[in-house]
């Protein structure tokens, strides 16, 4: 039986927790959605920079140390979070799929994905909530109508909380009407909007990266972005307090996936999917820390429950704020096609271990991707070709990919000692294989099947010569030759024409 947030508040009252008078009404719910942000905050044990606003928020509520996203890329993760369903259950697993146009270019016939379920904003709106999306990030891999999701959208899309800080997001809502909103913070995508503050020579470099100036620049810049993000979070909290909403708002702060560098964004290592989650709200006692496994689709269920209505039976997320909540014994994450790069990986995370199943071992992790033009990517390839990467770094940057990986996360947080072939861990390997097989069967993992010809063709139209995976060969002939030129492999020069 799934309890509502009101039952949760009643339970807390019985336990003696202090509740404000405003908590008797339906609480507001606000998602502080961080883009491309790794959890390098003080409250999560990082001492390199100071993040006072996020740290203060954590002290005011519950900090979740084992929060995992269902994907390491925005559109798949966000499609899951806004529905409470795994992206693989609703056919939203391929990054930026179901798009009728791309950067202003008409895609013609595309693989439309029409859902039979309602999104979280639609559910909340039907329950009487005023809904808004500050920042306008609507990166969903299914067909939807923004007007049905939100009462208010800012006229100008951006990566900061300016509209919310000005009070515009809730200014025109009904009197005493609760709101459900999302505020999108640019995080790792702030670019030059984040001042260069951090000393690059002092940043920590994980062992799976070569220690170079370019790598240090990438890491240092992300720290700069986190400093600016912390400022933005402070502005959001100040606006809630100024307008009298803070005491009756359930705040859920979390990130969609890790920062942009290799092994993090788009991948299922800890840097890609192990993200921050902080819950603050009426009736929630501050200063709590939990090691419970939480999936990003659980945010969806907790949000719906907060409105006082039952969580739909079809929803795969769990209301982790409910007093009868049963902790998960595992969480699942999935990697499928990202941009033009076709990949198929699944991850099972249990309290102690992580199991990775790499299905496409015919291609390395460093197969052609959108990151190839970056100077740091080109440096990685040069170092690899010159034999200047060590064994630890070659696990990811090498030309081979193991079909299975198993890591003891407590002893090996960087995931560099693969235990999959160690006889001592045969039992754990078998256990995690079974968990994955059962999950695939129960959820009907749509990523287990090849992408449709229409989906491949649409991707080929978008990216042209960058589509080098063999899966594209069966549809390549359907486009004019001028539209798809032979791709040049990264690091290889085109042969000179004979005179």
Question: What do these predicted ranges mean?
Answer:
Residues 31, 38-116, 123, 129, ...:
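Active-site segment of extracytoplasmic enzymes that catalyze sulfate/phosphate-ester chemistry
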Residues 52, 81, 143-145, 247-249, ...:
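Polar, surface-exposed loop/tail segments
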């Amino acid at each position: 039986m799934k309890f509502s947030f009101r039952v949760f508040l009643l339970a807390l009252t019985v336990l003696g927790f202090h509740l404000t008078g405003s908590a008797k009404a339906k609480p507001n719910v606000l998602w502080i959605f961080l883009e491309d942000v790794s959890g390098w905050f003080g409250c999560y044990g990082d001492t390199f920079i100071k993040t006072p606003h996020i740290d203060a928020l954590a002290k005011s509520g519950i900090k979740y140390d084992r929060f995992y996203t269902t994907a390491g890329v925005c559109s798949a993760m966000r499609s899951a979070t806004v529905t409470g369903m795994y992206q693989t259950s609703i056919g939203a697993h391929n990054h930026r799929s179901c798009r009728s146009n791309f950067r202003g270019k008409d895609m013609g016939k595309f693989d439309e994905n029409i859902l039979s379920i309602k999104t979280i904003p639609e559910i909340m709106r039907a329950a009487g909530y005023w809904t808004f999306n500050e920042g306008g990030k609507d990166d969903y891999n299914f067909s939807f109508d923004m007007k049905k999701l939100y009462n208010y959208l800012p006229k100008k899309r951006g990566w900061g909380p300016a509209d919310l800080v000005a009070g515009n997001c809730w200014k025109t809502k009904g009197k005493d009407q609760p709101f459900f909103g999302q505020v999108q913070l640019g995080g790792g995508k702030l670019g030059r909007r984040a001042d260069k503050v951090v000393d690059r020579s002092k940043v920590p470099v994980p062992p799976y990266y070569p220690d170079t100036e370019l790598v240090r620049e990438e890491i240092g810049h992300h720290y700069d972005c986190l400093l600016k993000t912390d400022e933005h979070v402070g502005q959001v909290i100040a606006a809630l307090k100024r307008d009298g909403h803070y005491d009756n708002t359930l705040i859920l702060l979390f990130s969609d996936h890790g920062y942009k560098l290799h092994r993090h964004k788009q991948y299922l290592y800890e840097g890609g999917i192990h993200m921050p989650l902080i819950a603050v709200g009426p009736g929630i006692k501050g200063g709590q820390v939990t090691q419970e496994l939480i999936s990003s689709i659980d945010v969806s269920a907790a949000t719906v429950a907060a409105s006082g209505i039952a969580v739909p039976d079809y929803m795969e997320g769990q209301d982790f704020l409910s007093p009868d909540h049963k902790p998960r014994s595992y969480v699942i994450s999935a990697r499928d096609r990202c941009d033009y790069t076709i990949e198929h990986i699944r991850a099972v995370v249990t309290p102690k271990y992580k199991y990775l199943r790499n299905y496409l071992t015919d291609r390395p992790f460093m197969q052609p991707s959108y990151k190839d033009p970056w100077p740091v990517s080109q440096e990685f390839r040069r170092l690899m070709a010159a034999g200047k990467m060590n064994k630890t770094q070659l696990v990811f940057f090498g030309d081979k990919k193991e079909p299975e990986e198993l890591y003891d996360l407590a002893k090996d947080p960087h995931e560099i000692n693969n235990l999959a072939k160690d006889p001592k861990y045969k039992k754990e390997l078998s256990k995690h294989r079974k968990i994955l097989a059962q999950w695939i069967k129960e959820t009907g993992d749509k990523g287990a099947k090849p992408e449709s010809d229409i989906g491949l063709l649409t991707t080929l139209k978008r990216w042209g010569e960058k589509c080098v995976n063999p899966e594209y060969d069966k549809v390549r002939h359907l486009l004019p030759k001028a539209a798809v030129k032979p791709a040049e492999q990264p690091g290889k020069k085109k042969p000179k024409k004979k005179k």
